[in-house]
């Protein structure tokens, strides 16, 4: 009997143990990453040929203590390699692990190689050659602290390489993991199996090979035992012949069918080629179509299983499309696949929540470095009076109601950008803004006391409901997370897409960027204030301080201002403002753009203006500013500087976003200024619920 080890992906060890025992293995012991077992020579070949789950079959050769590189050298040389190698066999060494002595795996591999070669030369035997690409023997050495374990890898290449897959195409899951997913799915061979996002067809091919009793090793052309002196070719040929006989019989007797589809025609062609090479091409129908076109291929029965490894995203901006995909799949399953089972393998359990289905079973496994989950669902049979479930129904109803009211109003006003929803319902704490045929969802970051997974699931529900109510494609929905603003956070860059969208606001055309920054370049709540500035600007000299992207300057220019001066500290936003002005035919000396610290520029300027708009930050202590600024504390001093630039009979429009802001009327009076609050006049219907979104004042000389 040989002591052997079968390695596998994390999470599949128990499944592998059952498989090995069915093959005849004894003494099976599960450890992390594999199973120790015992078996004769025939079992070695049986496990190599028939294991669908093992990554490699390893034959341990010995262990040694390693306190120096000489310990490793002599420990390896103590093994009788001349009884392991066939004459003329090539080899390669794979070394993993480090300790205080062996600090480089390449150095460790070199010492092992030297020890093996010297074992031959000392006996005056021809030295074996190294072949790193396709060796006859693979020697594996694992160094754990001071212990080196030396073994012969009888697999050669990993057992997931069945021989049917085109190696030029990347596979998101290995064949061994795919086989485990099929086994855990609850699917019964002989019943239909469908993968609506099949990619190169790995899940379906593994299922078909299992169902037709086709050994996973039948199509492999190279093994790790070809140069092994104890290899028994006669037994191997018996095992191989048996596998071929069973495969022919299994294919001839199998009567059910497999169905695969994908939106990418290239991967579907690759899937067809893979299935043909695997010998089961006639059993699988592959089609080019996306999930939106998914339909039950057997509406009158029998019931089957839908299985898939759907895509997942690592970035938040990919979520809308993926959430829509999962939501659509869930609805399609309920509408067309009543009585069927569904099994999905995913690295994103939260996305599976978008199915709006309750899982009966779930399993955990590793896909490379990724923690993954497989969830199995049974789809209830539908009845004539069954009503489809609505995702986030309260939120969807409110959004639908707001849309009906605001869409008509916006069209009459001549605006394309407006707020549709602003945390109307406390449990759905987001803002939804419309920008033409785009939508932006801003999630207000939940407090730390809220369960993060529940909050993420609710956000996914919001995205699915928003896409459904607005009827927009997922690629026109942008998702952002907004935290309480401090200093100039709103100006920090989030992305590098550089994609601008032209929108209309009354008679102005403006550029917005929905992805690269937390804000889009257009403060929607100031829309009416900008229109008022346009109406007040005719024939006047206009100053715009803390100008952001210059949209107020655009309205002033279109309103007939004699000239506009736009001041901001950010070169990025000044360039954006220049683009906005040019878009409206406003350019030349009459429309100046100045990059400067606004407070410093204000103290040094000696020009006069008829109309000044200033919308300062609530608080700022930027390194590029000479001093900190607090709008509550410093607004009177600010007005003192502004008054110096204000022409007789002129007006200052002063706005800020500080909640609970209190205007110091007495302080203004001492400066000879009066203030008229116009906040309510500047609030439009889409911000009617949030009357503290900003406050706005007209300030004039007394």
Curated annotation (Swiss-Prot):
Its main location: cytoplasm. The keyword RNA-binding applies. Pfam families: Methyltrans_SAM (PF10672), RlmL_1st (PF22020), THUMP (PF02926), UPF0020 (PF01170). It is found in: Cytoplasm. Keywords: Cytoplasm, Methyltransferase, RNA-binding, rRNA processing, S-adenosyl-L-methionine, Transferase. Its EC number is 2.1.1.173, 2.1.1.264. This is Ribosomal RNA large subunit methyltransferase K/L. It comes from Salmonella typhi.
């Amino acid at each position: 009997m040989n002591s052997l080890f079968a390695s596998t992906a994390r999470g599949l060890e128990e499944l592998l143990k059952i498989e090995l025992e069915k093959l005849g293995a004894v003494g099976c012991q599960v450890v992390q990453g594999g199973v120790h077992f015992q078996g004769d020579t025939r079992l070695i070949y049986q496990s190599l040929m028939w294991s669908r789950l093992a990554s490699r079959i390893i034959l341990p050769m010995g262990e040694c203590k390693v306190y120096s590189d000489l310990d490793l050298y002599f420990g390896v040389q103590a093994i009788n390699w001349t009884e392991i190698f066939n004459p003329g066999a090539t080899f390669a060494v794979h070394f993993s692990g480090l300790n205080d002595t062996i600090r480089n795996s390449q150095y460790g591999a070199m010492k092992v190689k030297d020890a093996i070669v010297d074992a031959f030369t000392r006996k005056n035997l021809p030295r074996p050659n190294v072949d790193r690409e396709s060796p006859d023997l693979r020697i594996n050495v694992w160094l754990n602290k001071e212990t080196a374990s030396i073994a012969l890898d009888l697999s050669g290449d990993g057992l997931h390489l069945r021989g049917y897959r085109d190696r030029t195409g990347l596979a998101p899951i290995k064949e061994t993991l795919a086989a485990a997913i099929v086994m855990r799915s609850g699917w019964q061979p002989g019943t239909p199996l469908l993968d609506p996002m099949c990619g190169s067809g790995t899940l379906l091919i593994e299922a078909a090979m299992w169902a037709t009793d086709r050994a996973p090793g039948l199509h492999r052309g190279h093994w790790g035992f070809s140069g092994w002196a104890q290899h028994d070719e006669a037994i191997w040929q018996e095992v191989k012949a048996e596998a071929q006989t069973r495969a022919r019989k299994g294919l001839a007797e199998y009567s059910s069918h497999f169905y695969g589809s994908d939106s990418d025609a290239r991967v579907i062609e690759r899937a067809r080629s893979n299935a043909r090479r695997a010998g089961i091409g006639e059993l699988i129908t592959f089609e080019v179509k996306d999930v939106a076109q998914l339909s039950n291929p057997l509406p009158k029965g029998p019931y089957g299983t839908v299985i898939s490894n759907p895509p997942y995203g690592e970035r938040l901006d990919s979520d809308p499309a993926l959430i829509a995909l999962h939501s659509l799949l869930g609805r399609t399953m309920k509408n067309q696949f009543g009585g069927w089972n569904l099994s999905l393998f995913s690295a994103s359990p939260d996305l599976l929540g978008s199915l709006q289905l309750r899982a009966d079973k779930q399993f955990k496994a590793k896909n490379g470095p990724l923690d993954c989950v497989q969830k199995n669902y049974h789809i209830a049979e539908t009845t004539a009076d069954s009503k489809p479930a609505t995702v986030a129904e309260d939120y969807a109803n409110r959004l639908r109601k707001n849309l009906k009211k605001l869409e008509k109003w916006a069209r009459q006003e001549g605006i394309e950008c407006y707020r549709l929803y602003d945390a109307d319902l406390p449990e759905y704490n987001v803002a939804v803004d419309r920008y033409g045929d785009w939508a932006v969802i801003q999630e207000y970051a939940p407090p730390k006391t809220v369960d993060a997974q529940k909050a993420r699931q609710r956000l996914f529900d919001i995205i699915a409901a928003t896409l459904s109510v607005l009827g927009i494609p997922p690629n026109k929905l942008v998702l952002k997370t907004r935290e309480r603003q401090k200093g100039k956070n709103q100006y920090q860059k989030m992305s590098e897409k550089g994609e601008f969208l032209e929108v209309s606001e009354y008679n102005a055309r403006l550029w917005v960027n929905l992805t690269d920054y937390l804000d889009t370049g257009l403060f929607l709540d100031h829309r009416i204030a900008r229109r008022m500035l346009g109406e007040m600007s005719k024939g006047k000299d206009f100053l715009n301080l803390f100008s952001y992207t210059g949209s107020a300057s655009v309205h002033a220019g279109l309103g007939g201002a004699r000239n506009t001066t736009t001041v901001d500290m950010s070169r990025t936003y000044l360039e954006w403002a220049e683009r906005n002005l040019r878009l409206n035919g406003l350019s030349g000396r009459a429309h100046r753009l100045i990059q400067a610290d606004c407070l410093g520029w204000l103290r040094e300027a000696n020009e006069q203006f008829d109309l000044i708009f200033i919308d300062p930050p609530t608080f700022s202590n930027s390194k590029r500013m000479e001093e900190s600024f607090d709008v509550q504390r410093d607004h009177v001093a600010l007005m003192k500087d502004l008054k110096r630039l204000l022409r007789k009979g002129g007006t200052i429009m002063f706005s800020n976003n500080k909640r609970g802001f209190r205007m110091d009327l007495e302080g203004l009076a001492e400066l000879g200024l009066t203030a008229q609050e116009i906040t309510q006049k500047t609030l439009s219907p889409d911000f009617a619920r949030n009357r503290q979104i900003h406050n706005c004042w007209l300030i004039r000389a007394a």
